[in-house]
Amino acid sequence: MAVKKGTLSIDSENIFPIIKKWVYSDHDIFVRELVSNGCDAITKLKKLDMMGEYELPEGYKPKIEVIVNPEEKTMKFIDNGLGMTAEEVEEYITQIAFSGATQFLEKYKDKTTEDDMIGHFGLGFYSAFMVADEVQIDTLSYKEGAKPVHWASEGGTEYEMQEGNKTTVGTKITLYLNEDSLEFANEYRAREVLERYCSFMPTEIFLSKANAEPEYDTIDEDDVLDTDTVVEHITEEPKEGEEGEPKKKAKIVRRPVSISDTHPLWTKNPSECTKDDYIDFYRKVFMDYKEPLFWIHLNMDYPFNLKGILYFPKINTEYDSIEGKIKLYNNQVFIADNIKEVIPEFLMVLKGVIDCPDLPLNVSRSALQNDGFVNKVADYISKKVADKLNGMFKTDRENYEKYWDDISPFIKFGCLKDEKFGEKMKNSMLYKNLDHKYMTLEDIIKEAKGEEAEAAKTEEAKTEETKTDAEESKDADAKEEEKTRIFYVTDEVQQSQYINMFKAQGQDAIILTHNIDSAFITYLEQKHQEVQFLRIDADVHDSLKDEVAEDEKEEFQKTTDSLVEIFRKELGNEKLDVKVEKLKDENVASMAVLSEENRRMQEMMKMYGMGGMDASMFGSQATLVLNANHPLVQFLVANKDSENVSIICKQLYDLAMLAHKPLSPEEMTAFVKRSNDIMMLLTK
C-alpha cells in the first residue's frame, strides 16, 4: 500500500491544548483510555470466536502489555485483540475517534470546575496526545489476507499511513512522550496509574521496562510450566548429616504478574465468597490493616445491572477521618472515587466498590443530579443497606449491638438525609441506657410512660380528695397535651452526679454522645410528636426531690428568698436564677440545670458562630439548684453574717457548674485557689 497522508478536520482551533486544560487534574486518564480500547478489541475477538466467525489460535491468552522505555522516552500499549485494516484505521482513528474527541470538547467548553465531567470518559484514543508529541499505531487485523498497517501523527492534526511490518494479530500504540510527561516512562509511576485505573479490568495487564535485566526464581522442577523459560537445571544434594534424595530444581525467568485481577470479588456470587475473601479484598483495595465490621454484597441484574461490595469500617472517631471511599466502576473500569451524585451522601462514610455498567458516563455532575436512572441506583443502594441492617437487627442482634456504637452515627446521618432510609430503619434504631443496655425507642417510651404513670398515680392519690370539678377537667386536658419525657446524657463523666442521682431513684436515661445526636433528637421529636427529649441536667426530676409539706411551705419560701438574696449578693449577679429544692440525695449540696429549650438555643448560637454573645440575652443561663436538706445550705441560712459565707457560696456555685459544663480558664484558676484556701482554713 502506498503512503497516504492526510489532515484531520478540526472545527475548533488548537483542540488538544484545550482538552489538556480541561482534564489537567486527571491527565493520566490516557492510560485508562488506551488500555480500555485494548480490552474492547480483545472482547470483540473472543465474541467472534464464540459466534464461529473466527477461530482463536491454540493456546491463545488475551493480554495487554504496557512497556515503558525511559531512555527512548516512550510508552507502548500492545494488545492481542482483533486489530484493524487500513480502512478501519482510516474510519476509526481519523473519523470516529476524532469525532469523539471533538464531541468531548463540545461537552466541556461550557463547564466550570464545579460542574466537572464525570471520569472524563469519551476522549478515547486522542487522550494519547495529552502526553505525547508523536503517536504511532502498528496493527494487523484478524481478517484473512489483511495487511499490517502503520499510522503516525505528530500533534494530532496531520497523519501518515502506510503498510506496516506487524506479524501478529492485534494493535501496538507507541507514545513518544513530551517533556512535561516523561514521568510516565518511569516504571513505578506507570504501575501507580495502572493500579489506579486498571486493577480490575477483565483482561490481564502486564507492565515491563524495556531492556531491563531479567529477574529469576528457583522452583521445584515438578512445578515448571510449559510457558516458563528455564535458564538452568539445578540438583540440590542433601546437607551433610541429612538423609534423603537429591532435589531437582529449576532456575526460571520470573513469571510476569498481572496488574489486573480479572475476576474481582464483586463479580462473584456472594455464596462463593468466604469471610477471608471479603477481608483480604478490603485490605488489598483500601490498604487498611483493620478488619471491617461487616459488609454488604450487592448483586442486581434487573431493572439495571449493578454489583459491588460496601464495607462498614471500624472508625476511631478520635483519630480517624470519618470520610470513607467508595470507588465507582463501569464494567470493571475505574471511573472515580465518591461520586456523590450516584452514591447517597450518607454512605460516604463507608468504603467499597460499586460497578454499574448502565451508568451514563460522558455526562456532567449536574446532569447526573437530575438523571432518573441515577436516582434509582442511589435508592437501590440505600434500600440494600437498610435491608442488611434490619436483617442483622432481627437475626443477629448480639453482633448488631456490638457494632452499634461504630455504625450509629452513619445510620443517624442516613435517617436525617434520606426520608426512605429513615422510615426503613425506624424500628431497628438502638439507644444505650445508663446500664449500657441497648433498647429500641419503643421500649424506652414504654418504660418512660410507666415511670411517669407511677409518679402521677402517687401524686393523684395525695390530691384527689380536694379537687373541684373544674380542676379535674383541667387536669384531663393537661394529660392529653403532656408529652412523654425521655432523659439523655451527653457526657458520662461530666454528668456523673446527675447519673448517680437518677440511678439512686431507679430512673433511667439514654446515652447520646455523638455530635450528630443533637440534630437527631430534633428529628425524633418531629417524627414522634408525643415525645420530648430532655438532657439529664435540664430539670430536677420529680423523683429526685421530696415534696414540701403544706404546713412548711411558708417557712420554706422564706428560706428560699434568703438563699436567693445571699447568693446573688456574694456572686455579684442580681440576675442569677436560684431554686431551692429538698433533694433526696443529701450528699449533693448544689447542682446546675439549664432548660432544654435554652440549651438548644445555646448550641444553635455556637453553630452559627454566635458563641461570643451574652447568653443571658436569650435567657440561657443555668439555674443554680440548692439542696435544702444539705448541712452547708442550712449553715448559710442560719449564719448569713458569717465570714465564711462568701467562700462557701462561690464554692457551691462552681461545684454545681463543674458537674454541668467545663469551667473557663479564669473560673478554674479561681476555683483551685479557693479550694486551697478552704483546706488552709481546716488547718487552723
What is each stretch, according to the model?
Residues M1-F184, E192, S199, D217-I219, ...:
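GHKL (Bergerat-fold) ATPase N-terminal catalytic module, capturing the glycine-rich phosphate-binding loop
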Residues M117, V135-E158, N178-S181, Y188-K684:
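GHKL/Bergerat-fold ATPase module in large chromosome/replication-associated machines
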